[in-house]
Regions:
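N-terminal secretory signal peptides
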Residues: 1-10, 24
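Early extracytoplasmic/lumenal segment of secretory-pathway proteins
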Residues: 35-97
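Periplasmic-binding protein-like
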Residues: 55, 117, 140, 169-178, 200-209, 245-269, 283-308
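C-terminal capping/gating helix-and-loop segments adjacent to ligand/active sites or protein-protein/ligand interfaces
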Residues: 71, 291-355
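Extracytoplasmic ligand-binding site segments that recognize negatively charged/polar headgroups
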Residues: 92-213, 218-227
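A ligand-binding cleft/hinge motif common to bilobed small-molecule-binding domains
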Residues: 94-99, 227-228, 233-248
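A bilobed periplasmic-binding-protein/Venus flytrap-type ligand-binding module shared by bacterial periplasmic
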Residues: 143-150, 186-187, 262-277, 281-283, ...
Length: 355
């Protein structure tokens, strides 16, 4: 979906000077005007519902170009090469691929003074070393969804899903072998980004032992299985949990830690509006704008000043925010690793499924 916000005065002037009437009765624009008009438009790409019309209007105040808002529903719909993005908001796993391909520019942090509002925990990342290319706007985490009536207290440990037969036949795991192995690594007390074969072999053994107790390995949606009463425990992202309307289903962050995902802003190298693009990102980090994004999405904000002025109900939502001790054990991850590691994970996952 494309939304355009243009200054009426400028548009009228273009209309008067840029169009000519030909003898055939067809109105055409000179070729030079196409280039001129493109140069006066700044394209922002974002997930659907990420940026409200009001926010786009706020951004318009800090640039002279007309803003063209392009939204997408999934990474496969971004169409990076054809949309001439000046600012792009995307999930970390997708942006890492663009960074690796050399398509994302390094940011000039001097042009983004509001970057000082970002929690220091996010100043580095596994997918963007030294945070040279991206600015985090929103984040969430993988945790445990459970049926409350089956538990006397929240099952806040991976043990019940990965290392116990107490809930045999009532557990839904992920169908993503790499993420599941990373979660097993966190349960064992090591970094989910380790590539040490010894630890990864231990994770494989753990999952093989537990397989007999698992109802589903990602073939079905874990939340749907919970709602239908087929399982009592499932691995889900808190982003997906927020739309559940069943009061008997809860969400908890495991104390061992887990995986964090981030939605970030960046500037493609193809942008010719570098300064204005930096101004847009800086405006996104304005506390009021950042607060609006976070409360609208009901996902966590890494912006300390935005959190400070947010509603109490948002700040105290335990589905959005883990407590301070647990969040320290959460990690982001890189999806681009060496070939040997990828082959090892793929082979181990096949072994787990075939066991």
């Amino acid at each position: 979906m494309v939304k355009k916000i243009k200054k009426a005065e400028t548009t009228r002037r273009r209309f008067i000077s840029g169009f000519s009437l030909l003898s055939a009765g067809i109105i055409l624009r000179p070729l030079s005007l196409f280039s001129q008009e493109e140069n006066q438009v700044l394209n922002i790409g974002s997930p659907a519902n990420f940026l409200s019309d009001k926010l786009i209007s706020n951004f318009q105040k800090v640039v002279s170009s007309s803003i063209n808002s392009i939204t997408y529903n999934s990474n496969s719909n971004i169409n990076f090469n054809n949309n001439n993005y000046d600012v792009l908001i995307g999930r970390d796993s997708y942006l890492e691929g663009l960074i690796d391909d050399g398509k994302i520019a390094e940011l000039n942090k001097d042009l983004i003074p509001n970057n000082s509002f970002i929690d220091p925990k996010f100043t580095n990342s596994a997918f963007d070393k030294d945070r040279k290319h991206t600015i985090p706007l929103s984040y969430g985490a993988i945790g445990i969804a459970y049926r409350k009536s089956k538990f006397s207290e929240p099952p806040s440990t991976w043990r019940w899903l990965l290392d116990s037969d107490k809930y045999a036949g009532k557990i839904a795991l992920l169908g993503d072998g790499r993420t599941l192995i990373q979660i097993a690594l966190k349960y064992m007390g090591v970094s989910l980004n380790t590539n040490d074969p010894m630890w990864i072999n231990q994770a494989e053994k753990l999952l093989k032992r537990q397989k007999v107790n698992i109802k589903d390995f990602g073939k079905k949606n874990g939340i749907e299985l919970l709602i239908n009463g087929e399982v009592d425990l499932a691995i889900v992202s808190n982003e997906n949990f927020k739309n559940i309307n069943d009061n008997d289903i809860g969400f908890t962050f495991p104390r061992e830690g887990s995986l964090i995902w981030q939605d970030c802003a960046c500037i493609p190298k193809s942008s010719i509006k570098v300064e204005e693009s930096h101004s847009i990102i800086n405006s996104m980090l304005d506390p009021k704008n950042s607060k609006s994004i976070a409360e609208n999405l009901q996902t966590a904000t890494p912006n300390i000043m935005a959190l400070d002025i947010s509603k109490k109900s948002y700040k105290e939502n335990t589905t959005i925010f883990p407590n301070a001790q647990i969040i320290e054990r959460y990690e982001d991850t890189s999806t681009i690793l060496d070939f040997d590691y990828e082959m090892m994970i793929e082979e181990m996952w096949d072994n787990i499924l075939d066991s």
